[in-house]
Regions:
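Walker A/P-loop NTP-binding active-site region of P-loop NTPases
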Residues: 1-24, 79-84, 149-151
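C-terminal regions of RecA-like/P-loop NTPase motor modules
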Residues: 20, 24-27, 35, 57-75, ...
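Non-membrane alpha-helical structural segments and their capping/turn regions in soluble enzymes
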Residues: 56, 94-98
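Conserved P-loop NTPase mechanochemical-coupling segment
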Residues: 34-54, 122
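Hydrophobic/aromatic beta-strand patches that form the interior of the parallel beta-sheet core
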Residues: 45-47, 116, 154, 186
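A glycine-rich, aromatic-flanked flexible loop/lid motif
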Residues: 10, 33-43, 72-82
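A short beta-strand-to-loop transition that corresponds to the Sensor-1 phosphate-sensing loop
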Residues: 1-3, 113, 117-122, 159
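Signature of the SF2 helicase/ATPase Hel1-core->accessory helical subdomain module
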Residues: 82, 122-123
Length: 209
């Protein structure tokens, strides 16, 4: 899977949490790393790390157990394309996606948790100027139900040209705007050393060339 083996993914999380990298100058020290790992271990549990294949059903079964033992605030399925998708007899992909997303929605409501599904677009499209178009949930392989069934949809997209280089946070759908905010775009910078996002400041012309 994209974030396996887990130890490598955990190291990335330690870097993000501490704000320090494991390489280069001013690298993270052992004490800081161990403290960060301890805190992360108290708050994050991994599902499906010892299995050859993971299905939505097995994820929810394990999440149910973890919720009983520890109490969960959220569940992240990342990424969608590494999950083994088992279709029922005569079930096409559109109906499968609709059924599975409905089951995730029901699980979230029953257990009062947030569920995030991280999914990649089929392919990146370009406009007439050969500029990459910001993908939407409709561009995810499988079904338009990724947009229709979700309460909220967010696209994280890198914008890079000769004038700017930033990460765009495109909030493309908010079902309950009266309490969860509105659609729109935010700009963030990305720190390649520690993997953290921060406030974006546009570079002036002298800094670009």
């Amino acid at each position: 899977a994209e974030n396996f083996p887990v130890k490598h993914h955990l190291l990335k999380l330690v870097g993000k949490f501490s704000g320090q990298a494991f390489w280069g100058d001013e690298r993270i020290d052992e004490e800081t790393a161990r403290n960060a790992m301890g805190i992360l271990n108290d708050h994050i549990k991994f599902i499906g790390t010892q299995e050859d294949s993971v299905t939505i059903e097995s994820i929810l079964d394990q999440a149910r157990i973890l919720n009983f033992r520890y109490g969960l605030n959220g569940l992240i399925i990342d990424p969608w394309n590494t999950v083994e998708h088992k279709f029922r007899d005569s079930e096409n992909e559109t109906n499968y996606v609709s059924r599975v997303l409905a089951s995730l929605n029901t699980f979230a409501k029953i257990h009062e948790i947030h569920i995030w599904v991280v999914a990649h677009p089929r392919k990146m499209e370009s406009d007439n100027n050969r500029k990459v178009v910001v993908p939407t949930p409709y561009d995810i392989s499988g079904s338009a139900n990724f947009y229709n069934k979700a309460d909220n949809c967010i696209t994280v997209h890198r914008h890079k040209d000769e004038d700017e280089d930033y990460v765009g946070i495109h909030v493309q759908k908010i079902r309950f705007q009266y309490k969860n905010g509105y659609t729109g775009i935010g700009k963030l910078s990305y720190n390649i050393r520690n993997g953290k996002y921060g406030e974006y400041f546009k570079q002036d012309e002298k800094a670009l060339f």
